[in-house]
Amino acid sequence: MERNYPKIQITDKAARSLRSGHPWVYADEVLQADAACVDGQIVDVTTRSGHWLGAGFYNSASKIRVRVLSRNANDRFDEAFWARRIRYAVDYRRTVMGQDFDNCRLIFGEADGFPGLTVDRFGPILVAQVLSLGMELRKQQLFALLLQTLHADGAQIDAIYERNDVKLRQKEGLEQGTGFVTLDGLRTDLNGHVTIRENGILYDVDYIHGQKTGFFLDQKYNRRAAAQLAQGKHVLDCFTHTGAFGLNCAAAGAASVLSVDVSEDALTTARHNAALNGLQDRVEYLCADVFDLLTKLAEQKRGEYDYIILDPPAFTKSSATVANAIRGYKEINLKAMRILPRGGYLATCSCSHFMTDDRFRAMLADAARDAQVSLRQIEARQQGPDHPILWNVPETDYLKFYLFQIV
């Protein structure tokens, strides 16, 4: 097939990275770019000697200069190409999610071959984030193809809402914004709330004002795993956000649940979710700084909780702040270990890619040593399979979740 795309030549180091399967070319890895390269459009990527490596989206305004789409020289980036990719992504979710297909991540960026595009499904609502220029220029086409695919499978989709209110867009030269997508058959007059069921628990998802796309689907099966230990336990659910871990534990028969968050708005949503499930009398809510609360409980050594869940926000979003993040993670885990009695249980996690599993495990080992306890590992888990991990793209591997008994 004759190729008419502009070319960029990259360094030997970048070529090795692409050959290993990583899809990004950084600005300082570009040796030469044709004058015909246009931001947001397809370019061919070659070695310094001209050997073809792949094709992807070019953006001179981004530190990620090229996001590789394909290493198949026969690919034509037409509607049929995108329709195939969408079909693969949807079929994969139908296979791995089964009955949970109604509420899952349908498209997970690079892991599905859509660099910079995320789409979550909450029943009849799709919520999208577009974080690359290449996807921005094609989003209407992709949304239409996704709708066609879902409708062909019998799924009812009422609306698509864009949550492009993220600073990452600025790194691509894109403005922030939100709003309903206008396409034939879609509504644009909804109130921004949808009720979903996950693990048997009902949640009110605020996809207009909630964090990220409105609800963290990646912890779906970790919540279920955590709930399996909860029967008869006195649970301290830290960083509860919309209350999901605590509600799963209450529904599983916990003796008591105290769910804590520093945000009163989050707790208002959590209380509403408890009421949706008839669990309002089974869960208490406390607006407090978790660091301060754990410090107080560790000093008291009262041992009133025998199960602590730590689901903090990402303490680091760059390699530059990893050291500070490790200190933060260690502080909350160390205090939790000191609060728990021997035989108590700890669920702990990190949602930062930069806090690698090796770093997280080392931090937990340090905390256990300082607390003079041993950790009996029950499970080591990760994000759900609707957030697939590509081994050659470490950025797709971000969520660590551990269940321990303190011995």
Description of each model-found segment:
Residues Q228, T242-A255:
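Conserved SAM-binding loop of SAM-dependent methyltransferases across substrates and taxa
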